[in-house]
């Protein structure tokens, strides 16, 4: 199974980025929280590619420190380059 984001989810993630611009950690945290709240989950590659969050793990850690109950689910999928890789898929609990 290839790790590809469905078009409807890509569009939703791109809209979140467009509607919530900014490079700051707080802006990235806001986009991640909106993605988790509205879409139910997001993977690290989706956060990097579609939410412009270069260090999603750091942002997740900061959000957890603020009290958000974010759960990580590990999954192994094929990357766009065709290699197997372990990804984190995050959800709100």
Model region roles, listed by residue range:
Residues 27-41:
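Short amphipathic alpha-helical interface segments
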Residues 53-58:
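Short, basic interhelical loop/turn and adjoining N-cap
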